């Protein structure tokens, strides 16, 4: 007999669709349940106050989980976009490095040097290297105008 009473107390009634609808409506207006509202809802829905309080607590937990999932999806898509942008930029950098190497080799051939131009000489503005830089700029302009440069090349 004692066993059948404890089973009866532990068995919970499911909420009706109307009760759930009213609880949902109230939840959209107030995420936290004030004692007065809890009493009012309890009387209005014919539910124990504790059941109303637990429903709100569970709903807040589900709401937070859903919000975190939405945030996660948003962050994940932003991360994927950033990775895609990074890959495109790396491709552009590689292309520009290759183009610079070709231009330096062309300059080396143009100035009848045996080896490619030393990087440190090209960036210098010393009087000794001014002529070489001017020649490099002219050669690069020629290189670009012949359709080998970035002006006619797509980055895709």
UniProtKB/Swiss-Prot annotation:
Domain of life: Eukaryota
UniProt entry keywords in alphabetical sequence: DNA-binding, Homeobox, Nucleus, Transcription, Transcription regulation
This protein's record includes keyword Electron transport: no
Subcellular location per the Swiss-Prot or TrEMBL entry: Nucleus
PROSITE patterns: HOMEOBOX_1 (PS00027), HOMEOBOX_2 (PS50071)
One Gene Ontology CC term in the entry: nucleus
Tissues showing expression: Expressed in roots and flowers.
DNA-binding residues (ranges): 8-67
InterPro entries: HD, HDZip_class_I_plant, Homeobox_CS, Homeodomain-like_sf
Region annotation Leucine-zipper: where it falls in the sequence: 68-96
Protein known as: Homeobox-leucine zipper protein ATHB-52
Lineage: Eukaryota, Viridiplantae, Streptophyta, Embryophyta, Tracheophyta
